[in-house]
Amino acid sequence: HAVLLSLIIAGFWLMDSLKDPVLARIVGIEYQPIAKVISVLTTLVITCVYDFLTSQLSKANLFHLVSVVFGVVFMIISALLADPDGGLRSSDAPGPHRLLGWVAYVSIECYGSLMVALFWSFTNSVMNLEEAMGAYGLIISIAQFGAIAGSTLATNSKSIGISVLFLAGALSIFSVSLVVKVYHVVFRRKLRSAYAALQTESEFSRERERAT
């Protein structure tokens, strides 16, 4: 769990540190308040879709879906940022008509909100109270290494390149799906027991609601 959260935090901190410079270069930093409002509204819509999907997919499949979607999105953004005609090296003046800056900003905000919530939902579904009390502090502590790694990479954006860092962020997101898959293979028996307990609890709640 700590490795999983570290990867999520590393990717988020890496790209979150770059979203303002990208917005400033492509759209204009004066449009940041508007970008924040758009991000909030978009996150609300995506959260509604996420709530629907939680009843249709398992937590693991949700991780795979979210990782693939955001990973592909950030790979595309990375390629577009490297484009000499419309990317960061374009001779065009910043302006609100350049959609790439908006999309990059909103995508980063949505990823941070959705992926962290999904992680804690997944963790709570496979840990009992005793395990949680002993592990949560350790998980959060180890996850700080991800934050340090992501923000450290971002400070070297001039030498590495922002488009390359977005690609690194996309790869870290894809690795989240891989770690979840490995976790399910290694701890398959424990997960089955946890999901069975959740299903039993859900059925009991429905029966109690019918009785009342």
Q: For each predicted feature, which ranges?
A:
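Juxtamembrane extramembrane loops of integral membrane proteins
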Residues: 21-37
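Intracellular loop-helix junctions on the cytosolic face of multi-pass helical membrane proteins
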Residues: 2, 29, 33, 56-61, ...
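Transmembrane-helix boundary and interhelical linker motifs in polytopic inner-membrane proteins
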Residues: 43-63, 127-132
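Pair of pore-lining "gating" transmembrane helices in MFS-fold secondary transporters
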Residues: 1-24, 102-110, 212
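Intracellular juxtamembrane helix-capping segments at the cytosolic ends
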Residues: 18-19, 111-128
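Glycine-rich segments within core transmembrane alpha-helices of 12-TM secondary carriers
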Residues: 32-48, 133-158
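Central hydrophobic cores of alpha-helical transmembrane segments in multi-pass inner-membrane proteins
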Residues: 9, 16, 35-53, 116-121
